[in-house]
Amino acid sequence: MPSKQPGWFANVNPNVFFGTVIIIALFLAVVVIAPSSFELLTQQLKQWITDSFSWFYVLSVAFFLILLIYIACSSIGRIKLGPDHSQPEYNNGSWFAMLFTAGMGIGLMFFGVAEPVMHYVNPPSGDAQTIEAAQQALRVTFFHWGLHAWAIYAVVGLALAYFAYRHNLPLKTRSALYPLIGKKIYGPWGDSIDIFATIGTVFGVATSLGFGVTQINSGLHYLFGVEQSTHIQVLLIIFVSILASLSVFLGLDKGVKRLSELNLVLALILLVFVFIAGPSIYLLQTTIQNTGQYISNLFTMTFNLYAYQPNGWIGGWTILYWAWWISWSPFVGMFIARVSRGRTIREFIVGVLLIPTGFTIIWMGFLGNAALFSIIHEHQNTLIQAVQQDSSVALFEFLGHLPWSGVMNILATVLVVLFFVTSADSGALVTDYLTAKTENSPTWQRLFWTVLMAVLAIILLLVGGLAALQSSIIMSALPFTVVMLFMSWGLIKALHLDVTKMQAIQEARITPRAIHNPRSWQQRLGLIMHYPHSEEEVREYIEKQVDRAFENIKHEFRRRHLEVSITQLEDGMQLRVDHHNEINFIYKVVSRETVPPSFLIGRTEAEDGQYFQAEVFLREGGQNYDVMDWTQEDLIQDIIDQYERHLYFLNIVRS
């Protein structure tokens, strides 16, 4: 393929972009030409994978959850997803809203009522339609949508965010394998990994669009008598895609973020309504009891393969869920990484695991228990019949038994549409990240993927290929599980090095810079109290003093046969010492705006003025000290101090 693309294609990675499009086109050709044969083949392969590799899925997902708990509880959790000085890009409310809506918001609308009722009617073990079956139904539902699902997303998201923001690698799936294959991520290996992730994202969103419009169509039929047909569903896909395109056009902050926040608010309104209109005390009691049973049985359920009572249930439920979450993890993990810069690893893991799981438990607990209450205590068996005939109408049938059912069903329909829009626009943004050369790609690229997903969903809906596509996605989860295990291995290696460096810096015996400083104490105090108020003053210092110090020490390093480079940055200057196959040493002096301490200068001046400082940055980020007005000798001594710490760290790594 050509290495340079003129015009519109100037910002695409041609190998990933065109490779993805060609494979999708070939897949469509096969499905359109022989849909029945292809569906039969994929169903047989899916069944073989389920029968032969259930144990592998169960062990892998258990490992991901245990790994995250270990990382969060260890000293590794203090490491930031970005330089040490970085701060979260989004507040907690916006962050959670985007996690929730991109991860599984639409699934909660579809299965919030349907899955507990399904397990109540057909439990994995024991007698159906009993109190024990009701308790087991909620416990299993929590299990499928709780910690394990978010652990899968969190492993991919953590690996991508760590290598992208901590080590300045591209925010692409390939970067998570850097510790294992090194610079090969920039070649065919890396392109292949990104193509795989891109195809999974496109197929996953297209499948959700195709199946999801059936629920929207069901809601419109239930509310307004709109015909349930393929033509109506095609129009709905076009409508959802237009809304998604508008959100994509507005971008992450103005489009996806605001839409996610609106989704969360509307979902909370629906949840509160169900709680108030339903049996409130019963919902509180049962949800709390279900949560306790979920937690107390978590370890047993994690490793339960039903090996002594094989009935096919685990393959149709737990293994299907694990495979589905894994197949979606490149998309959701990438999106989580994109919105999580600046958070500590502990904050990331706790947030991604516990907050969505907690909301899921409340959602499933309230809606599921309210539905079971109407079946068990109010004998509303029509809900069972509705779920068995068409699970997509379960939510609307359930709301029909509550007050204000018309208004709430309209709200539910709007929520379903908005959740699909957020899934589609998030998928388009992620796909664009994977196929573009830089993050700042032209709008047409993001819109292209939105349109492609819609076209793919429409074609598969018309030829009846959605089931085959769903089976193909689930099949793709098996090789990607292996990729995730390698990701985890590489992540552990890199995190271990990061912690080792933190310990090396603390343990290194370095002579304090003040001992080298020949100034009097009066001169040193004057420097401490000096607060420049113009960025030009700091930049002038960097261009003169820092540049000369860097040139002098570069000369000495090169005399000792080390490769050294000096780079002029937009806001400062960087010195880099190459160590080839080992971690390079980086020392930067950067002009940064900060708040002047009001106890040293007049409060009015502190509040009104701007204070810039010349801050030292290492590979790990800002070091929180100012070198403004240091002499060249002071700077060189500090560089040597930091370089000595770096060598101490490398010695520990070697040993």
Model-identified regions with their sequence ranges:
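N-terminal alpha-helical transmembrane segments of multi-pass membrane transport
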Residues: M1-A133
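Membrane-water interface regions at transmembrane-helix termini and the short interhelical loops
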Residues: P2-F9, A34-I49, L68-Q87, A137-H144, ...
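Flexible loop linkers connecting adjacent transmembrane helices
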Residues: P2-W8, L40-K46, C73-N92, V117-V140, ...
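Transmembrane-helix boundary/entry motifs in multi-pass membrane transporters
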Residues: G7-N15, T50-W55, D84-A102, A137-L147, ...
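Helix-loop-helix module between adjacent transmembrane segments
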Residues: W8-F18, I22-V32, L65-I69, M104-L108, ...
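Loop-to-transmembrane helix boundary motifs in multi-pass membrane proteins
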Residues: A10-I24, G182-D191, V226-S245, F249, ...
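Membrane-interface loop-to-helix entry segments
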Residues: F18-G19, T50-F56, S60-F63, I193, ...
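Extracellular/periplasmic helix-exit of transmembrane alpha-helices
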Residues: F111-P123, F275-N297, T357, I361-Q389
